[in-house]
Amino acid sequence: MPKHEQYFDYVKINLASPERIRQWGERILKNGEIVGKITKPETINYRTLKPEMDGLFCEKIFGPVKDWECHCGKYKSIFYRGVICERCGVEITESQVRRHRMGYIELAAPVTHIWYLKGIPSYISILLNKKVKEIEQVVYFNAYVVLNPGKSDLLNYGVILTEDDEKWPYIEEKLYTKELMDVELGIGAEAIQRLLSDLDLQAEAKTIREILISNSDKKKNTQKRAKLIKKLRIINNFIATKAKPEWMILSLIPVIPPDLRPMVQLDGGRFATSDLNDLYRRVINRNNRLLRLQEVFAPEIVVRNEKRILQEAVDALIDNGRRGRIVVGAKNRPLKSLSDIIEGKQGRFRQNLLGKRVDYSGRSVIVVGLQLKLYQCGLPWEMAIELFQPFVIHRLIHQGLVNNIKAAKKLIQSNDPIIRDILEEVIQNHPVLLNRAPTLHRLSIQAFEPILVEGRAIQLHPLVCPAFNADFDGDQMAVHVPLSLEAQTEARLLMLASNNLLSPATGQPIVTPSQDMVLGCYYLTVDNLKNQKGKGSYFINSEDVLIAYEQQRIDLHSYIWVRFDTFSFDDILEEKNIQQVLYKREIDEFGTVIKVYNTRRIREDKDGFCLTQYIITTAGRVLFNKVVQKALIMEI
């Protein structure tokens, strides 16, 4: 069969009407027969290993198990495509249709959709202005609701009545007398459906808006205002999507295609099946039992109990464990419901739809790149040659080094020295994207200029770690190569790490020293009285200090005197509120004054002009000052 690509802009998820659910599952065959309704809980016949008719794997409803072959075996060829078998009623088509054809279960009694009853917020309770517990009592047959108060002064429309209510004995006694003859009480999901269908959304929205406008003092009744706003928002959503509130009560259950809930035969004749099949089977069994009880006019208390059990079975199918006991399978393992399949990290959306495998991407552990600039990352040679292979092959052919792709790949596999030079040319001005999961904000994906490095770890500048919320204790990051020129331009202009210095959430700098960098700065500038090697030595400039440190004549933390004539330290000392203590004052034979303080030594002439100035510091602080000064000069 020809395959047609379907293009779409977005996926819209909203409430489905009973007619829409029936439309999903129901089909009219060429012979006029309507199929789609599942009435039997059976899956496959244990003798023939073929699907049971009208069961959860029915070939008439969902399509043939084998391509171009019907259930009974009368037709076994593509030649009969589209033919409906006279014996079994199966359409001759591809087995692939079992991945998208749906069925439905028609319920003997309406049930509440648990997402809208027990979800946060509870849509049903907000629309009906009731507590969730009250709605729950009605749904699970523990309380009544007044659907029509009639002429009674005791009752009001929508009031919840339980057997513990003080009015209940009187109402129960007089319910079928003339006094309360026109009073109508309801119980179960049918009663909630009736209340929801009686709602006039347009009128409700108008009333709420008038209340909100008239209530000018916003400080009073803040909680009441918030409830009204929440209700108005829900009503507006229903109006905008053209959905009706009573659709939150289900009368039809859609059954997903059988190939999405498969049953697989294992070695030894046993079968492994999806948990959904067990949950669907529970619903069908209880639904069929309720139908039989209704047919034989069973007592109301028995029918109500069966309706409650059906409600619980549907709850378990939609969201197992949301309410009541968790339905378990073999070895007390909770069965995976539809919600469990959809939600969470391993769910359908995050795992299969958003988390797809990507070409031209790699993944490795991150380590510190000491020599890197902020906008650079160290890319391992092995990873780079794989990611940029198409560009390398193109360059090899373009330069005439090889004639075809096969020869180029052979040259790459042989690790020819020319490949490294070609790769260096290719990655120049070609940014790569680095992503660290979880991608919580836009700074979790940034662009960097790759630098080829040895080893197998990706090297990263430590200043960009706060943006990625990364550290170097085994974190992994993914690399992606933007292929098109437009993608490369966008990566360079918008996503380069040096262009993302501020947090989009707060506006505060996000490129801040942290962890190892802070520890290193602290270690360079800290006092350490144990390291006394070269203590008290004099140096003419900072270069001499660093040479002496490299020659191990002084320790990193030894206090030394360094000549520093550039400017006076008085302003800095005042700003830092550092007290100067004059230890000694001498006048030499030339009349120059030598002042020795706790932080510096000054030599002044007769007029008080500073001739030389030595400050007390350490080799670590000199090194720190030099690095910071160099970085500032480079930025300027």
Curated annotation (Swiss-Prot):
Known catalytic reactions: RNA(n) + a ribonucleoside 5'-triphosphate = RNA(n+1) + diphosphate
Record key words, sorted: Cyanelle, DNA-directed RNA polymerase, Magnesium, Metal-binding, Nucleotidyltransferase, Plastid, Transcription, Transferase, Zinc
Pfam families documented for this protein: RNA_pol_Rpb1_1, RNA_pol_Rpb1_2, RNA_pol_Rpb1_3
Entries under InterPro entries matching the protein: DNA-dir_RpoC1_gamma (IPR012755), DNA-dir_RpoC_beta_prime (IPR045867), RNA_pol_asu (IPR000722), RNA_pol_N (IPR006592), RNA_pol_Rpb1_1 (IPR007080), RNA_pol_Rpb1_3 (IPR007066), RNA_pol_Rpb1_3_sf (IPR042102), RNA_pol_Rpb1_clamp_domain (IPR044893)
Compartments (UniProt record): Plastid, Cyanelle
Cofactor(s) the protein needs: Mg(2+); Zn(2+)
Binding site for Mg(2+): 471, 473, 475
GO biological process, one term: DNA-templated transcription
Protein EC: 2.7.7.6
Coiled coil: none
Main enzyme class: transferase
Co-factor binding comment: Binds 1 Mg(2+) ion per subunit.
Binding site for Zn(2+): 70, 72, 85, 88
One GO CC term on file: mitochondrion
Molecular function terms from GO: DNA binding; DNA-directed RNA polymerase activity; magnesium ion binding; zinc ion binding
Alphabetized SMART domains for the sequence: RPOLA_N
Superkingdom classification of source: Eukaryota
Family: Belongs to the RNA polymerase beta' chain family. RpoC1 subfamily.
Function: DNA-dependent RNA polymerase catalyzes the transcription of DNA into RNA using the four ribonucleoside triphosphates as substrates.
Name the record gives this protein: DNA-directed RNA polymerase subunit beta'
Organism: Cyanophora paradoxa
